[in-house]
């Protein structure tokens, strides 16, 4: 199975995909997230990962033992929600445990810890998304190395889905907007402060304002401090998103589809005029696609 790891400023998201088979799209079997902490060692992250894999019924390391593979097959089908009778799985179809990995990060100090984790505990040399990685997407930025890996990964996944011009809105620590041309080129985008950063700024900078949970208020017109802050944050960010997307649409000479991802995509996307689809697993899907392209690249060399 493939372990995809998206290391963000706030959270690290893990996705487990079934082993890739020619002609089939591997399913995302399960996923989980932990808080990003720069000071954690590879041993600490390994302990957390091993525990979470166990809770999700995924063995930690790969095996080619037929009995173990059959047991892993049962776990895979259970994770996928299948109720059909279990059939023996071939060694080629599923390895027991994690047999491949791919990493992407916007937090360089954490990258080295995860590389050591993969090599020491999983005995895998993971693909690291960065300059030189075969994404299959030309980058039309002034300096392509300045574009965050997560933004390119999202763009790859969105273009693979639509095969047309598209805009990706990612609600992370920062809110990013990324435009892809109908030819599958990364055109550029915009970066705004994330809604969480704005909420924290209100709490820290205004002495009488409390910290509030990010929820959709009943009304735009708040009747108390908490609902007023929630209205300003939620609807203010919906307005920000719609405003930037509409300006981007007016600036390009091709139609675009708009997809949102990130932990708050569904909360904010439901009130947006411009967001057409929300997919919280878009980045994990992009990692899986790039891993497959790297595999094909390796087979040709």
State each model region's role.
Residues 2-72, 184-211, 215-219:
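Short glycine-rich, Thr/Ser-proximal phosphate-binding strand/loop in the N-terminal lobe
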């Amino acid at each position: 199975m493939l372990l995809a790891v998206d290391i963000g400023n706030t959270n690290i998201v893990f996705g487990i995909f079934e082993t890739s088979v020619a002609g089939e799209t591997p399913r995302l079997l399960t996923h989980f997230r932990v808080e990003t902490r720069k000071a954690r060692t590879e041993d600490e992250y390994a302990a957390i990962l091993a525990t979470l894999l166990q809770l999700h019924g995924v063995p930690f390391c790969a095996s080619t033992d037929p009995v173990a593979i059959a047991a892993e097959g049962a776990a895979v089908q259970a994770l996928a929600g299948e109720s059909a009778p279990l059939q023996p799985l071939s060694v080629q179809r599923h390895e027991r445990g994690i047999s491949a990995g791919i990493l992407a990060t916007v937090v360089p100090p954490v990258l080295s810890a995860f590389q050591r984790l993969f090599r020491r505990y999983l005995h895998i040399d993971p693909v690291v998304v960065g300059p030189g990685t075969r994404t299959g997407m030309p980058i039309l930025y002034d300096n392509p190395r300045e574009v965050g890996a997560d933004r390119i990964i999202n763009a790859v996944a969105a273009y693979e889905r639509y095969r047309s011009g598209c805009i990706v809105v990612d609600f992370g620590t920062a809110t990013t907007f990324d435009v892809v041309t109908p030819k599958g080129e990364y055109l550029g985008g915009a970066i705004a402060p994330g809604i969480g950063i704005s909420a924290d700024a209100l709490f820290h900078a205004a002495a009488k304002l409390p910290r509030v949970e990010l929820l959709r208020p009943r009304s735009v017109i708040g009747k108390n401090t908490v609902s007023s802050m929630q209205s300003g944050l939620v609807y203010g960010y919906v307005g920000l998103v719609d405003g930037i997307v509409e300006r981007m649409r007016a600036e390009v000479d091709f139609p675009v589809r708009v997809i949102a991802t990130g932990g708050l995509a569904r909360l904010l996307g439901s009130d947006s005029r411009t967001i057409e689809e929300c997919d919280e697993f878009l980045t994990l899907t992009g990692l899986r696609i790039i891993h497959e392209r790297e595999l094909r690249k390796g087979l040709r060399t």
